């Protein structure tokens, strides 16, 4: 007997394979979280569990279109919807033996462009993990020379206080710039990505200093959970000091305000 989750998975797969067959996904970007690479990963896992020759044939046709786009078009370069995410996805597909593809030439051709984009993004205040420089730093985490340049750019652009580093960045459409401690687009992603950087040749003292001082700022934003329903604001207390209610979606950018959920015993 199928579970509700299994029914939902089949429903998602049916829509994706139908749209692939009809060419409706051909114009999507190549990204991992918002693009064709994420779709391919889902479909590869789906066919592992639920083999279907017709769907496998549809996916093969889609892969041809995907690789043509990957090798012939320069679109977004970012982790979420662009080329860096596609490379991360291909690395995963190869590692999990879901796909065997040599993309080293493509990666080599884009390396300088991606790394230059990452450094310039950080220097211009766009360190954003999903849509800026940090996603590229994560992908090239073993390239010590590049990582050290990224660390230098981060420290150079930080606003420095008493054992505190903080950065201003875009807060979204019509919201200007401000401080953001969240994971997807904010300073928590700086801590997360830099914590992965352990390869030989990386300036560990600088890395640790940035992590420590960024954590100090994040922790300085803690609020009373009894009053607000959560421990931290969604972005920063500094952006709107007059705001009384700090409902939070700290963990991810796309969730609704879900802070009451952990206290709902019916969800246990």
Predicted regions and their residues:
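Structural helix-adjacent loops and short alpha-helical linkers that scaffold large soluble proteins
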Residues: 1-10, 46-60, 93-108, 141-149, ...
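Long, well-ordered core segments of solenoidal/helical folds
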Residues: 5-24, 57-74, 102-123, 149-168, ...
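Acidic, glycine-rich loop-and-beta core segments that form the ion-binding/anion-interacting portion
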Residues: 198, 206-243
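Single conserved hydrophobic/aromatic residue that forms the stacking wall/gate
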Residues: 257-268
């Amino acid at each position: 007997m199928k579970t509700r989750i299994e029914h939902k998975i089949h429903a998602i797969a049916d829509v994706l394979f139908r749209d692939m067959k009809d060419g409706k996904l051909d114009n999507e970007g190549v990204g991992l979280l918002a693009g064709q690479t994420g779709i391919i990963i889902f479909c590869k896992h789906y066919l592992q569990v639920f083999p279907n020759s017709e769907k496998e044939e549809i996916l093969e046709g889609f892969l041809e279109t995907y690789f043509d786009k990957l090798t012939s078009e320069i679109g977004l370069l970012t982790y979420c919807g662009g080329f860096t995410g596609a490379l991360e996805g291909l690395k995963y597909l190869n590692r999990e033996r879901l796909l065997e593809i040599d993309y080293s030439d493509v990666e080599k051709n884009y390396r300088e462009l991606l790394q230059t984009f990452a450094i310039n993004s950080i220097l211009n205040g766009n360190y954003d993990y999903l849509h800026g420089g940090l996603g590229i730093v994560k992908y090239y985490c073993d390239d010590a020379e590049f990582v050290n340049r990224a660390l230098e750019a981060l420290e150079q652009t930080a606003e420095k206080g008493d054992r505190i580093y903080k950065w201003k960045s875009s807060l979204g459409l019509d919201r200007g710039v401000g401080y953001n401690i969240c994971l997807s687009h904010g300073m928590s992603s700086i801590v997360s990505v830099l914590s992965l950087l352990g390869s030989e040749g990386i300036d560990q003292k600088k890395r640790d200093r940035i992590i420590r001082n960024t954590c100090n700022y994040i922790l300085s934003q803690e609020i009373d959970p009894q009053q607000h329903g959560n421990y931290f604001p969604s972005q920063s207390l500094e952006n709107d000091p007059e705001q009384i209610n700090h409902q939070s979606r700290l963990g991810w950018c796309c969730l609704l305000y879900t802070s009451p959920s952990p206290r709902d015993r019916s969800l246990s």
